[in-house]
UniProtKB/Swiss-Prot annotation:
This is Cysteine--tRNA ligase. ATP binds at residue 270. InterPro entries: Cys-tRNA-ligase, Cys-tRNA-synt_Ia_DALR, Cys-tRNA/MSH_ligase, CysS_C, Rossmann-like_a/b/a_fold, tRNA-synt_1_cat_dom, tRNAsynth_Ia_anticodon-bd. Zn(2+) binds at residues 29, 209, 234, 238. One of its GO terms (molecular function) is zinc ion binding. The gene is cysS. It comes from the Bacteria. GO terms for cellular component: cytosol. It comes from Rhodospirillum rubrum (strain ATCC 11170 / ATH 1.1.1 / DSM 467 / LMG 4362 / NCIMB 8255 / S1). A motif ('HIGH' region) lies at residues 31-41. Its EC number is 6.1.1.16. It holds the Pfam family tRNA-synt_1e. GO terms for biological process: cysteinyl-tRNA aminoacylation.
Length: 459
């Protein structure tokens, strides 16, 4: 099946044609590890996790690289304010990021380079840019000369005047042009730094991704992804550095960007009091519900995070897991991902359409009457879920929360009450049976009576 993706560079949806059909290479900008991941950080992780899963279905080998930015002024400021070391902050934040993303069903990338482990690559790249006349040293800094690249601004579509006026550009006296940006900056004794031909210092943000993508994917690769907010200046500057260093026609062939995130219709910010971390939400709802909620909106569209949307996603998963629990004793027939789901995802990751196909598959499973039909429908549904990163858990665990000692105790109490209710109904003591149902409802337990008996789930 042919994959079509929207290329930010050309502003059109194109047929994806990899440089090497035997090996697709993908780079995505990762987190700056100074604080807990918020839901805005989670969206690109989920989007490009799905893209990597899809690419692996279509091509024999995929290398997915997502970096960790562990040298940055925000990290320095957090260390200074907290009294902790930079290493303590970055190690802890990276670990927590991994834990949070795993709960969202995101698979780890194939390579996750840290900026601090690739300073030598950055220094070498800066040296080449200086040698080619695209960068210059000034007062301990090294800056990229934006006017030296005639095609600068091609990704964002901005003119030089627009970029200077719209960007928060530090117009320092040592800059030859106001748009020039930092590749290397000096560090005093209080800041992290590495020896370089220009003295002790640290890299600028943009050179980090250029160096790491080239290190692991080569000077030219297939797809570069990230959030819409990174188009300018970060991705624009990555292109400038990489193309001027490695030559015309190099760097990423396709650019993919996910849309902005809102919270209850407003921009997320600490000043508005609606800053939500992934952990905040994981304390309230399963990560799988968060994943489904995000997949319900096309990745290029703005996503409005709402409590109602999260609840709808949870209810949708309840329906899916309830159906899977009803056929728990039937082995799923081996199945490929259904064509409708694949076609939707190959159409620029059209997840709303793919999920509509999933709910159609759910209907097929619910209508199946023979064991053969149920096995086939179950296999198709699970295959679709495996690609989407959904409903791969034990239905009993999802619906009833089995696992911990406390949850097992709850399950035992519920099962006992279900037995009492069954006995009351057999004795035609319907008042007692209804009272038990009401008691369970008040405890957040939903009963579902079926031809094979009564099952239950948490509301």
């Amino acid at each position: 099946m042919t994959l079509h993706i929207h290329n930010t560079m050309t502003r059109t949806k194109e047929v994806f044609e990899p440089l090497d059909p035997g090996h697709v290479r993908l780079y995505v900008c990762g987190p700056t590890v100074y604080d807990r991941a918020h839901i805005g950080n989670a969206r690109p992780v989920i989007v490009f996790d799905l893209l990597a899963r899809l690419l692996r279905r279509l091509y024999p080998q995929v290398t997915y690289v997502r970096n960790i930015t562990d040298v940055d002024d925000k990290i320095n400021a957090r260390a200074s304010a907290s009294g902790r070391t930079i290493g303590e902050i970055t190690e802890e934040t990276t670990r927590l990021f991994h834990e949070d993303m795993a709960e969202l069903g995101a698979l780890p990338p194939d390579v996750e380079p840290r900026a601090t482990a690739h300073i030598a690559d950055m220094v070498a790249m800066i040296e080449r840019l200086i040698a080619k006349g695209h960068a210059y040293e000034a007062e301990g800094h090294v800056l990229f000369s934006v006017p030296s690249m005639g095609a600068y601004g091609s990704l964002s579509g901005r003119s030089m005047d627009d970029m200077i006026a719209g960007a928060r550009v530090e117009v320092a006296p040592y800059k030859r042009d106001p748009a020039d940006f930092v590749l290397w900056k000096p560090s005093d004794a209080s800041l992290p730094g590495w020896d370089s031909p220009w003295g002790r210092g640290r890299p600028g943000w943009h050179i980090e991704c250029s160096a790491m993508s080239s290190r692991y994917l080569g000077p030219s690769f297939d797809i570069h992804g990230g959030g819409l907010d990174l188009i300018f200046p970060h991705h624009e500057n990555e292109i400038a550095q990489s193309v001027c260093c490695n030559g015309p026609g190099t760097f990423a062939r396709y650019w993919m960007h996910n849309g902005y995130l809102m919270v209850e219709g407003e921009k997320m910010s600490k000043s508005l009091g609606n800053f939500v971390t992934v952990r905040d939400l994981l304390d309230q709802a399963p990560g799988e519900a968060m994943r489904l909620a995000m997949l319900g909106t096309h990745y290029r569209q703005p996503f409005d995070w709402t409590a109602e949307g999260l609840e709808q996603a949870r209810r949708g998963l309840d329906r899916l897991y309830s159906a899977l629990r009803r056929v728990a004793g039937i082995a799923a027939s081996p199945a490929e991902v259904p064509e409708g789901v694949m076609a939707a995802l190959c159409d620029d990751l059209n997840t709303p359409k793919a999920l509509a196909e999933v709910y159609d598959l759910l209907g097929v499973l619910n209508r199946a009457t023979t064991t053969e039909e149920q096995a086939k429908a179950k296999g198709a549904l699970l295959a679709a879920g495996a690609l989407l990163g959904l409903f791969q858990a034990d239905p009993e665990v999802w619906l009833c929360g089995a696992g911990t000692g406390e949850e097992e105790g709850l399950a035992a109490r519920v099962e006992d009450l279900i037995c009492q209710r069954k006995a009351a109904r057999q004795a035609r003591d319907f008042a007692r049976a209804d009272a038990i149902r009401d008691e369970l409802t008040q405890a957040g337990i939903v009963l579902e009576d079926g031809p094979n008996g009564t099952t239950w789930r948490k509301a």
